[in-house]
């Protein structure tokens, strides 16, 4: 079977898909990982077929404006900046995934890539699955969403999940 593994995110999001690709290849499947271009060497070093998405996530994550906002710890400004920066890539990434999807009988997507592949798989009648290795995400007042350094204040903790969700949607959808 020709399987496409579509994932977006950091190296930590990519590595589990490399392990999955190795296992699938060892069981006779033809596997291609579709992800950001800066992970090409990491993936091809394992003799896995690679299809690049044009965005270099590491380059975009370490721009001076992003680093400045992170240094100041203002997650609302960070959310706005991520939304603004990601808009220029999302349409192109969806088109790139759409083009390469013709080579797959089945697509397995990460949680961050799932919204991008869903309309493509439905349109082309390609079977798909979602595989998510991220930490659990349940809105609670007991502690803030990951990435938030707020003191443990219950109403702020709950708000942090809305901000986190907004950032995730703007960055990866």
Short names for language-model regions:
Residues 1-51:
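N-terminal subdomain of nucleotide-sugar transferases
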